[in-house]
């Protein structure tokens, strides 16, 4: 099934509306489940991804699909002047804003409710854009990536951290077993949303990755890109330049 057709719930609502509802439902347990399912390795992935911006010294960063803000907070280590996070889920943003308050970062960070496919920003506003486990949830992938290209300044970088599909034994077999059979059961019990953690593996399986995804980045206007596989191909960092 095509990536755009994978949705969390069996309803007539648009994919983006279903995604917002899903993340609202699981927002209170999202951070715990994220770190639990990955055994904390997702934190290492974020650190490595943000290091790709270390030499660029970006002053204004946009974190798209910011969720509860973990990627944005990691990007704060670059000491930018401002980070703006955008997400379609009010529930996730509520959790993220509490983190901003707790860290006393109100003067440097702002989280806004918004649609990544219709960003309310001027052209070429941001020095860098980051997305962690978010592009897979875009309703229209090319439209969303085109919007990221539009608001990124010429020469700026896009950093995407996303799940991918390992190819080699035994990581491949262990990954698919865990992802398809174990994670959905635990996720359902803890989050109390029976669909959210079934949607996760389905969306990963349908998502274009590697060179196929890089071709899409090129198609929407990014001049060059590279893919960095992580932990045996469980996830990938994509670095693209406008």
Question: Which functions belong to the PLM regions below?
Answer:
Residues 1-20:
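N-terminal auxiliary segments of SAM/dcSAM-dependent transferases
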Residues 17-18, 88, 161-216, 220, ...:
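C-terminal alpha-helical "lid/dimerization" subdomain adjacent to the S-adenosyl-L-methionine
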Residues 29-32, 39-59, 74:
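Conserved alpha-helix/loop element of class I SAM-dependent methyltransferases that forms part
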Residues 30, 129-130:
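Hydrophobic beta-strand segment of the Class I
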Residues 60-118:
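Class I SAM-dependent methyltransferase SAM/SAH-binding core
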Residues 117-128:
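A short acidic, Gly/Pro-enriched loop at the edge of an enzyme's catalytic core
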Residues 142-154:
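A short glycine-rich, Lys/Arg-flanked "PGG" loop and its adjoining helix->strand segment in the class I
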Residues 214, 220-242:
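Core SAM-dependent methyltransferase catalytic element
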